[in-house]
Amino acid sequence: MASSADVYVFGDQSTPVLDKLQALVRVKDNALLTSFLGEAFLAVRREIVSLSSLERKSIPEAESLSLLLEGVRRSEPHAALDSAFVCIYEIGYYIDYLARSDKQHPPAAPSLLLGICTGSIAAAAVSCAKDVFEISRLGVEAATVAFRLGMHVRRRAENLGYSTPSSWSMILSSNQEELVSEALKEFSKEKNLTYSSRPYISATGPGFTTISGPPSILESVKSCDTFSGKRLYPAPIYGPYHNSSSYSESSLEHGLASILEDVGFLENEMLIPIISCASGSRLDQLSFGNLLKNVLSSALSQQIRMDLVTDALVETVSGTEATLIPVNAQTTVCSLADWLAKRGATTRIGPTLESLTKDRAEPNLAPGDENKIAIIGFSGRFPEADNLDEFWDLLIRGLDVHKPVPEERFARDHYDPTGQRKNTSQVQYGCWLKSAGYFDTQFFHMSPKEAMQTDPAQRLALLTAYEALEMAGVVPDRTPSTQRNRVGVYYGTTSNDWGEVNSSQDVDTYYIPGANRAFIPGRVNYFFKFTGPSIAVDTACSSSLAAINLAITSLKNRDCDTAIAGGTNVMTNPDNFAGLDRGHFLSRTGNCKAFDDGADGYCRADGIGTLILKRLPDAIADSDPIFGVILGAHTNHSAESVSITRPLADAQEYLFKKLLNETGIHPHDVSYVEMHGTGTQAGDAVEMRSVLNSFAFDHSRPRDKSLYLGSVKANVGHAESASGVLAIIKVLLMMQKNTIPPHCGIKTKINQGFPKDLDHRGVRIALKDSVDWSRPEGGKRRVLVNNFSAAGGNTSLLLEDGPAVHPARQHQDGDARTEHVVAVSARSTKALEENLKALEAYIANSWAPEGELLSQLSYTTTARRVHHSRRVAFVTNGLDDLRKSLLKAATDAGQVKGIPAVSPKVGFLFTGQGAQETAMAIGYYKSFSSFRSDIHQLDSIATLQGLPSVLPLIHGTTPVEDLSAVVVQLGTCIIQISLARFWISLGITPQYVIGHSLGEYAALQIAGVLSVNDAIFLCGHRAALLDKKCTAYTHGMVAVKAAADDLRQHISSDLKVEIACVNGAEDTVLSGPNADIESLCGKLTQAGYKLHKLEIPFAFHSSQVDPILDDLEELASQVGFHEPKLPIVSPLLRTLLTGDTLGPQYIRRHCRETVDFLGAIKMAESQGIMDRSGMCIEIGAHPILTRMVKSIIGQDFRCLASLRRKEDHFKTLADSLCALHLAGFSVNWDEYHRDFASSRNVLQLPKYSWQLANYWMQYKYSWCLTKGDAPVENGPVGAVVQARALRLSDSVHNVIEQVHGDKRSSITVESDMHDPSLLAIAQNHRVNGLTMAPSTLFADIAFTLAKHLIQNHGLDTHTNLPSINNMAVEKALIVGETGPQLFRASLDMDWTTMRGSVRIFSVGANGKQTTLHAVCDVAVENPSSHRESWQSNAYLIQRGIKQLVQGASDGSAHMMRRGLLYKIFSNSVQYGSAFQGIEQVWFDSEGLEGTGKVFMPSGKDTFALNPYCCDSLGHITGFIMNCSDSLDLDDHVYINHGWRTLRLVEPYQCDVQYQTYVKMQAVGSDDSTYSGDVHVLRDGKIIGICGGVTFKKVARKVLEMLLPKPSGAKAKHGVVKHVAPEPVKHVVLTPPSTTSHSVGTTSPPEPTESPVGSASGLIQKALEIIADEIGVDISQLTDTTLLADLGVDSLMSLTILGNFREELDLDIPAAQFYEFSTVQDLKSFLGANDQDFSSSNSEAESSASSAASTSPSDHGDDVVEEVKPVVAEIPRSTSTILQGTKHCSQTLFLFPDGAGSATSYVTLPSISSDMRVIGLNSPYLTKPHEFNCALQDITGSYLNEVRRRQPQGPYHLAGWSAGGVSAFDAARQLVSEGEVVESLILIDSPNPVGLGKLPKRMYDFLEKSGIFGAFEMGEEAQAPPDWLFQHFCVFIEALDRYVPEPFEHGMAPKTTIIWAADGVCKNPDDPRPEAQPDDPRGMNWLLNNREDFGPNGWDEFIGAGNISTMAIENANHFTMMREPIASALCAKIRETMGVN
């Protein structure tokens, strides 16, 4: 029997593989295949990312091979992807073929491989693979090579001018090679084709010939006589393959070298011979590298000769039975079999993969690096440690940081040592974060209001995630593994403390997203825009390690490429302490006593930890820092335990051994175990047993391989859901520090239940001192981290050291760059300053070599940092210089402005002649591989055209003056094209180009007009024509500093001198014969002109070039001119070039005519292409054009250089990149650093300098202790529950809250201005007709609060008396006509300083501040010290009083009595009799000095500091200032602005005679401000001083504007009904903690209001609205503040705009508001519109205007509802004014669609200037989880809000989508109640009957299509909050249940239905979800084009006669709501409502 041989035939890209490769991807039972396909995709993706940004645009983005295949299917063919897909498919096919057949690899029987074209690459990988596993590894390398080959061919096609993919080959079904060859030669000659355009024969064989060439040429070939009538089939080959004329030997060698660069396994030897498809020869005994060179050379430059292949196979298989096995080559194999059979060979065709039916055998993959996970960054917050350094410090010092529960968490009354009281615990200790509430709201774009409601765990997860990413140097989208859609977030979290006890006390908008645990990872995803998995894990104590385990699994399964993983635990809920204590988990004596014999439970702890994880190969490829490597992680459960909470040794032991076995690690190679170690008797014993059984089961462990045990819980407690990640971070720090810290858990003696032979087993515990733990030489340390859960779960993780030397830097040279860019950025000025100082300090403390440190600093701060809006950057060559620059920049940080929202325009300027030099661009050539590759590629094109190589110009081997014009000019062009490409590769893409003279060739190429091939052809052959037809140096050019018009007057007719270039207003170049030039130069010199002769051989743009023009035009006719891809500014035509103006004639004129650079730049400036804010980069040897451009546009126009003479190119490049970065461009820093491997080390620089403030919502009143108690006995349901109030005085009516501690105390009180005692004060004090509280009332309140706290603190009130200092009245407290009118006061007292601060403010119905009235300070002082010092000066005061009294007698002073005095006073202040305490006054009008007698009769009041008396004692100052004839008082008054100090040695009393004295003195040089000290005397002794009483001059008109008219007083406050006083809670604080109540420290006082009728008043009001809405002090709204940084998102913007319309009558379109990026932008707009505002606000606005976005408390409704029994009430709907103001004549109400928010309508343009448009919000908008009622049930809530806005009809209602159904139901209810609905508008609202619920696949489709779920905000689409989508889902549920009721006959309103004409999938080829049988009607209605524009079922409910319909063309359901179609919609609405 004849022997057999297998011939595997690998096909080329002519056979489609997309579907077949997709089928392979779906194979799930071949692990090796799956692994190969995944790795091959990653390899291809790395190649894609390495391309320039321009090249990447042609490749669809995808996160998997499957998605990439789908993307390619919908896009144009791509040669690189085609080539790679063929290779991947064929290798995958071969792998799967082996698994499904009986074949082996290497094959047992004789075998051959045959690869056709690109199929040879796959064949090469198979040939050189030693086993099936190596096929996968070599296959990945082959895929890389195939992609590069295809990219090489694509670039050649583009260089030839063919960028649009079309077929480059067609097959003639006959073998007539000679005939075809002759025909093609004749064709090329006839068409005058250049070599690169000529068609050629690329393949021949029995029965076929393949003709290849440019697509447009092939089309012409078809019409040749030779091929007329013959069948030519196009082949899917998209580039010039198999073309020998395209390559010289050197260019081919260079091309192969670039393709094979860094390819692995090149030394592998062939195991299976290959038949060459080019020669038919047998290839064997070659290395993989040489084999690839052979097959690549064949694919690029050699014909396919299937005739020779057939000959070779006949010879090879002779005498054997050959089996031809097709691998993507079924057609080829059939043809081969036929050809062989005709030659007598015996062959058969083997089975295909599809025909095999054997079961698949799944190979086991050997463990390797691809299964390892690198930890590349980590961060955390730890008990008593805010950063990693502090954490390590407490570890190494062996500290135990447990402490009592801080007061800010919960009160001490939750502790009960007896354990008898309900809900208490006997535990009083924990381990606590120092700064749990601190957060940087501006950085994370979160408003303080939202931050306050957001769980600190969420906020700290954000902070630590950013820090860990920064540590890792992760820049999103930098590499394939950091694409945003490939980053997953996994956090373990088990408690919900914040939502349970803190934010639940005041449930508001952000309660759900702020408190729900799922938002912890979700918040990280959302902020960073990571769209990978977002998963919260709860496995109790092991949550964080379980989350990390899940992240590792996701990485291995390629669900993501980068994982952010960790855990959080912030304890605020006392119930958890109580529950764990009563469950016997917790220690009552302190911290976790791990390994101690007296272990009695665990100590609870806070903790946050975050890790950044990647697959190890990805981390190495990305040059990431690697701090540790995870070998494996697993989780199981102790299900067999006796109790669910009791750990099981067997389960843990199984887990440990499973890890060791799977990772191949010997137990003795593990040197440290980080134990769970909670310090419980059961847990410690079980864990020790399982660890010893696994790692030290006997005494065989070598002495030099000790096993150390430890537990971080002994230091920082048990952080529960964060405990695992904290343990890992401890281990990572140990690896960094090479030290095992001491274990502090053993307080008495080691657990006696542990085995006694630990020492013999080699087990150690570092007890007192730290232990050296250095990495073994050439080895790795390995660690087990163990974590188990109270719920029975066990998770363990095995990790080891990372690579000792990063593989990317193993074979590195030093960084050759002499100058480096170092960048620093921040999001705020203060952060920028601190970042700069921190970096300087880091450098100062570094010991690294200067060159290495500088290089790596540059890499880290540019390529590995996210760059923020405030930027500074430096170009430096030394550390000293850099440190000085950093400190200088820190000082000047306040001057740094944010980068513009849109980067400025940038253009490329291409220099002309005259700048060339020897060794031009040599620095770039040597330093940057991409530039060097482009030079070689372009040079090879030139040499193939018969032109000389330009490399001598670059290498500098020949001086430039000795080089030919061809080399110089062509070299300039090639260098410029390469430089431009280099800039583009750095991320700088030009928006326009300008070429000066010679430079225009490169400009035309970069703009896409000329292919690279044609640009080289024209430029090179033009220069050759010059050499041939012109004589060098017979003509010259001279630059003259003069205007062209002036020079024309000097050029006589006998001189053949012409103007060659007009470079500027006084910058002109002349050209002509040398003699004429010399003659003219003499004249010009005599005339005083400055000139400079240019050293060039030829004078372009002169008569010298006339001989070449015809030939040049003929050459130009041979090339193709394409439409420009970007604007080209033409100096020839002084206009923008278009396809019509470009052609051979243009090239001719360009050579000969004048270069009007001046005219071109002016034109570009006039058309907005160039402007002063823009930038340009000069592409040339020296920035010659820069000077010209600046002289035309202005010196501030920024021009950057690529090269400068006599300047290191590194400095030039660095300077330019630095400038671009600072201008806001996203520089591709990775590309900049790519060629400098030694720099690619991520330094561990100081972390970002957060600007933190404390956002803490205090848990109050210990209400957890009373949960479940019977309610306090109430009266009838709904009655007010009157709790006993604590009234301190007649000014302090009710104590709301007081907290007393050793170091701090605080109190908050509430009073009613309509209480008789306070109302009397205000009614006796009227200013400008307004009833107003005096400032002395505020002083009394402050005095009262201070005395109360002094008494409660146990101090003697006789020796500790408060002084009231720095009183500042911010806004008058005006009393309304009706009450109650509540205001509050708070005092925070610091007993360490005996100082406190007071705030007095009005409150709304919800108890929240509405207006701040006054602030002051309190100081507790001993009055005796004042009495002594005052008495020493009393004689001076008494002498002054005496002189004034005597002066009244001698005429030098005046005396006045009470009646006249207060009558004069009444001009400004009307005092009632109760305030008229002055009996007599003596005063010196000119000296502003006075004294008075004051007597106040006694009353029944209980004031601490009687305001009547206090005010009267101060009247002397007001009288002196406003009754003086020495001051200008005709048009001005002097207003009291507070005082500096008010000190008493005894309280004021009634029925006592006082004497007052004051002398007022000017402050400053003018009369605007006066100040004085009021002395109060009793019986001649000073008993009080009011110091620094200040009056300021105010115009009477301004005063009238500042103070509202009395008629408006009615609206000055909200009417608040009485509520039950809250019980007073006394909280005892344990030192040294303090109580934190609010944001940061005391808020600064609010600024005084500006007049509202002015621009500044408008701005002030607007800023107050914004500040109030986002919850910040108005002082934070600085001009440079970014609104987005404050959390002003789309939803908040809607509310703010509504408030503007309601309170300010200011209508700003939403789209315009979104354009305001900073506060200054808004202020500029408001300043420009102040006139409109002023005219519409003639009356002063109320200080308590109702908010535009309303809530229940805004309505003044009785808040007693809070104590009603809980019933299923519908929450109130809210609304926002979207358009118009209250003055509009009509109002249109828009009902929300399914999302529930009015934001759906914000994109509508103005409907009418006379229409107010109000958008309603769903009552369940932010709490969709509560939406469980019917749709018609919420209609009443909507109507309540409609009636609040418009109490009576007629009404106009409308709604889009599902909102139309709500509008219909509302209209029906209104009509049934007798109201008039004038119009109902249904905007593309389907009839709800039978609509059906949309399936999730529909949502996914809409979201993926970018249709659903994005809200346009400015130019950026922002995703809405998660609850918006949740609301949509629950609303659709309600809509599905809704059964509409028809209107009663004759009652339906006029109804208009406006339909969109199109479906979402308008065109047949539009993507659409796959149809399913259960697709609901609503789904088809959305997707398909509409055909019926009638009522569509609505007539059943409204009546056909009441309905009119309209349709909007070219609009679908979604696009109709956005511009430009929204304008058409608004026009339809106007038409319907009959408005203009």
UniProtKB/Swiss-Prot annotation:
Locate the O-(pantetheine 4'-phosphoryl)serine modifications and list their residues.
S1690
Q: Where is this region: Disordered?
A: 1628-1654, 1733-1758
Q: Name one Pfam family in it.
A: Acyl_transf_1
Disruption-associated phenotype: Impairs the production of bikaverin and its intermediate oxo-pre-bikaverin.
User: What region holds the PKS/mFAS DH domain?
Assistant: 1293-1600
Q: Does the keyword Phosphoprotein apply?
A: yes
Q: Where is the Ketosynthase family 3 (KS3) domain?
A: 370-801
What does this chain do? Polyketide synthase; part of the gene cluster that mediates the biosynthesis of bikaverin, a red pigment also considered as a mycotoxin. The first stage is catalyzed by the polyketide synthase bik1, which catalyzes the formation of the intermediate SMA76a also knowm as pre-bikaverin. FAD-dependent monooxygenase bik2 might then be responsible for the oxidation of pre-bikaverin to oxo-pre-bikaverin which is in turn methylated by the O-methyltransferase bik3 to me-oxo-pre-bikaverin.
Annotated active site: C541 (for beta-ketoacyl synthase activity), H676 (for beta-ketoacyl synthase activity), H718 (for beta-ketoacyl synthase activity), S997 (for acyl/malonyl transferase activity), H1325 (proton acceptor), D1511 (proton donor), S1857 (for thioesterase activity)
Residue numbers spanned by region N-terminal acylcarrier protein transacylase domain (SAT): 8-242
UniProt pathway annotation:
Secondary metabolite biosynthesis
Name-wise, this protein is: Bikaverin polyketide synthase bik1
